[in-house]
Amino acid sequence: MRKLLQNSLVKAVIEILDDLKATDISIFDVRGNNGITDNMVICTGTSSRHVGSIAQNLAESCKQQGIESFGSEGVETADWVVVDFGQVIVHVMQQESRDLYQLEKLWG
């Protein structure tokens, strides 16, 4: 049952990110790599305004579907915003931050 819920959550998040025009969406199954979450999603926004908008609208859209976030970090600067849904953590980044931190190398 947990895997089914997890897959539904990942699918919902990806669909919303796509609707919000996030680009370069990557999904990583990190079960066994950390004790924090099961999946990491990374996507890119075109500007700080776009990154902040993606993160805020993602949380709002998920809430409308009955999916509550545990919170978000980085909204003030919006270079890199993290939205925590428990089993899925979403990283919304500007391209410069994504290039600098290279999270794909960490989890890929």
Where does each model-flagged region fall?
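Positively charged, small/polar-rich N-terminal and surface patches that mediate targeting and assembly
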Residues: 1-39, 43-108
